[in-house]
Amino acid sequence: MIQAIYDGMWDKFIIASDRNEYELDKHLIDLESDTRRGITALTYLKQGSGSTLDEIVKFQTAVQEIEPKQYYHPLDELHLTVLSVISCIPAFELNEINTKSYADVFHSVLRSSPPIEVKYQGVTASPNCIVVQGFPVNDALEKLRNNLRTQLTDAGLRVTFDSRYKLVTAHSSIVRFRLPISDGQLLLALCQQYRNHKFGRIVFTDFELVFNNWYQNLAVTKSLASHS
């Protein structure tokens, strides 16, 4: 199922490349005016081995050499979204919710959750971004997501998860398109070279519940709870 989702993205990317019909994110031109904020449970890739991160950065750098004007997620902001608890909403503020209640549920669920291991192999893309494909090695991530969904809902807390789509993948976004692509076919060829590239594996043991903007920029992010 996860591979089918990645393949569906890839098919749309090929069409966008052939037609030069990319979806450019104008918010990335002026981040300071973007007021969209949300609540997310996540884990950062930086806790992984150096070799895996080096491989990801190597690919990201290769893209940057041919498309220097796009947006590149910094290494320390690369993340795996466990659950988008409240999807980013314009002008959303922390004083609208009881953050302790969310933190309590987060801690309750994570206490009984094992580490999450993800295999990173291949890249896929869409008309608006490029991601590294992640594949959980077992059902621990799925169980964690479902437990968070259940307990947050049972607690009667404000949530919007699964409003756009039910999160089942383990991808990490690394490039977003904000300006016209200068050479779509060259970019496509590079992505094809890495379509099945083995980046490595990461065992995630540290998790956070954060208040964030759309791009998980650390300058905006506020940690509400952490578990390790």
Language model: regions and residue ranges:
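Histidine-dependent nucleotide/RNA phosphoesterase domain, centered on the 2H-phosphoesterase fold
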Residues: 1-228
